[in-house]
Amino acid sequence: IDLVAQRGIADKFHFPGFMRGRQVQEVLADSDVYIMPSVSEPFGISPLEAMQVGCPSIISHQSGCAEILSHAIKTDYWDIDAMADAIYAIVKYPAMYKSLRELGRDEVNNIKWYDAGLKVRRIYNMVLGWG
């Protein structure tokens, strides 16, 4: 927050503090881009929440959800130039924004916990030699 103030760009950011449920969805839906430059995130559900309401997402390759999301931009968490380029591209190119928005929403809406459970079960069965 201090850095944003020092650079005189406070009008470009919103730091809402802790939010709940519907508040989170409303803020994400009003956002141009969601960024999760996580060093290590076992899964990280917040990019899925952003994508579900049509907010293009930038995530780190190191986050667990990077393995399942095809329609999020992925960078290394330490590569701030790549993150800045991704933000710029999403904001500058309407077709890219629209594509990430629509395809991301569709992708997340088609993720089913039941399907994930079946995949895990198949892997267990394969490893245990049960079929």
Specify the residue positions occupied by each region the protein language model found:
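Short alpha-helical donor nucleotide-sugar binding micro-motif in glycosyltransferases
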Residues: 18, 26-31
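Short hydrophobic beta-strand element within catalytic cores of glycosyltransferases
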Residues: 56-59
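Aromatic "clamp/platform" in nucleotide-sugar-dependent glycosyltransferases that forms part
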Residues: 39
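A charged, aromatic-enriched C-terminal amphipathic alpha-helix characteristic of glycosyltransferases
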Residues: 95-126
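Nucleotide-activated donor-binding/catalytic signature segment of Leloir-type glycosyltransferases, i.e.
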Residues: 1-19
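Short glycine/serine-rich donor-binding loops of glycosyltransferases
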Residues: 44-47, 65
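Conserved acidic donor-binding segment of nucleotide-sugar-dependent glycosyltransferases
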Residues: 72-81, 89-94
